[in-house]
Amino acid sequence: MEELAVEVRGSNGAFYKAFVKDVHEDSITVTFENNWQQERQIPFHDVRFPPPSGYNKDINESDEVEVYSRANEKEPCCWWLAKVRMIKGEFYVIEYAACDATYNEIVTIERLRSVNPNKPATKNSFHKVKLDVPEDLRQMCAKDSAHKDFKKAVGAFSVSYDSENYQLVILSVNEVTIKRANMLSDMHFRSLRTKLSLMLRNEEASKQLESSRQLASRFHEQFIVREDLMGLAIGTHGANIQQARKVPGVTAIDLDEDTCTFHIYGEDQEAVKKARTYLEFAEDVIQVPRNLVGKVIGKNGKLIQEIVDKSGVVRVRIEAENDKNISPEEGMVPFVFVGTKDSITNATVLLDYHLNYLKEVDQLRLERLQIDEQLRQIGASSRPPPNRPDKEKGYQSEDLSGTGRGSRPYNNRGRSRRGTGYASDIRYGDPDYRKTTYPEYPRSQAFWIKGTNSEASNASETESDHRDELSDWSLAPAEDDRDNYHRRGDGRRRGGPRGQGMRGRGGFKGNDDQPRPDNRQRNSRETKARTSDGSLQIRIDCNNERSVHTKTLQNASVEGSRLRTGKDRVQKKEKSEVVDGPQVVVNGIP
């Protein structure tokens, strides 16, 4: 039951709305609506009850009515006694009776009501019952909510606890309330005692629960995940959250979806941090040099896929040059990794290691190229410049076991003969370069030979170059020697077996008496001069430069092992010009 409303008459004769707080012997204590006046005691004769609900009569001219109005702006509206003077449609002209001077006002029907039929209150209009409260229930009775059911059962409009007298005060307008209150008092106090006992137990249990929760949740982690990564953090059907909750020592995981904030509670710090690794998804950018992007990705994306698989990141993307979201550094391409913080850290370690490896390899290759360039420069400065183009030189630098003229193998003849001192050392670090040690011509010498991908590979000669070079020499084997060799169909003959040249050139030529016919093709551009009583000596230095010297027959025995004694050979056809005295021919030019 709500508070009991009454109407209190003021000094001006108007009735103001108020509420009963307590009942005394000859007065009641009331509080006014909106607290426009302080709480005070009002005598019974100045108090009346409001009219019954639904009480309303037809209002006619000359009827006494009550008008809901106010005397000034400081006071609330109240009910004033008045009389209807005229009715025009919905408007009523009324005259106030409480005023000394006649005062008329035009009002509507909403502000009018019939005169309140209730008389002023008396001592018997209100009933008050006091019940002593046991000592153990005093604290319980101080709560108004504890008497809600009892108040409804006895029909009282107010049940309150008097802390000064330790009494339960019951107020009512019905006399039957006194009887019901006395009848239900023992039962009410017993139920209060039971409720109090249960409430104390629940309160103690709540305290223990709160204490346990605080103890269990003394470790707390809080972090925010980007809104576009919340789906990855939660996982399919909340799989990641369930996995984090299964971590031993984690007591609770809360998610604030509005702020995308995770709260993790646990018994120890390690459990909380481990659960965080399952839920904290982020995005990180790693800058990769543009010239290494292809090597980082690998063929068909094999290398970058290996990094993704081993690190555990969800995905990686390579930003386009025109992407405005990420401003790449100059000469760098951004690789964007998406995943947990732990997986991104692993991906960063793998990628940094691979980038350092690629940079070291490039540095080693650059150093090797610089060394090779210096070696080529040293080799070029240590030998005289050639008088003929490289294509006219007398040996192949690219294929040591190449064929002679007529595409036949050298078969250990001439310059292709390999002695016991021959050694070869090929470096495979770079296929463009090979280092070969040749036998003595006349002494051992090391050469750097550039591969087919280099510029020096243009120095290799073709079969036609061999053919032209043979025509530069005016020496040929004797007729007896030609019988020992296989005769070619084109009339060309292979040189003697004991010459130092690769094709039988440069052998010792004796002073033969009988001329022999020579049907070989001669090169009219270059002719070799010789004396009538001299011999030709061919020398090849370390730079592959050939020189022809004429010597007398007496000096032939001095050469020893260097020049072999040839058999009787038919003297070549005498040349038109005979040079008097020794003449030196270098590279076929006198």
From Swiss-Prot:
Residue ranges of the region described as RNA-binding RGG-box: 494-507
Classification via InterPro entries: Agenet-like_dom, FMR1, FMR1-like_C_core, FMR1_C2, FMRP_KH0, KH_dom, KH_dom_type_1, KH_dom_type_1_sf
One GO molecular-function entry: dynein complex binding
Pfam families: Agenet, FXMR_C2, FXMRP1_C_core, KH_1, KH_9, Tudor_FRX1
Biased composition (Gly residues): 497-509
Chain ranges of the KH domain: 222-251, 285-314
Region (Disordered) residue spans: 376-438, 453-590
SMART domains to which the protein is assigned, alphabetical: KH
GO BP terms in the entry: DNA repair; glutamate receptor signaling pathway; membraneless organelle assembly; miRNA-mediated post-transcriptional gene silencing; mRNA export from nucleus; mRNA processing; mRNA transport; negative regulation of cytoplasmic translation
Superkingdom of the organism of origin: Eukaryota
Biased segments, Basic and acidic residues type: 427-437, 510-531, 561-578
Subunit structure, interactors included: Homodimer. Heterodimer.
Full protein name: Fragile X messenger ribonucleoprotein 1 homolog
Source species: Xenopus tropicalis
Gene from which this protein is expressed: fmr1
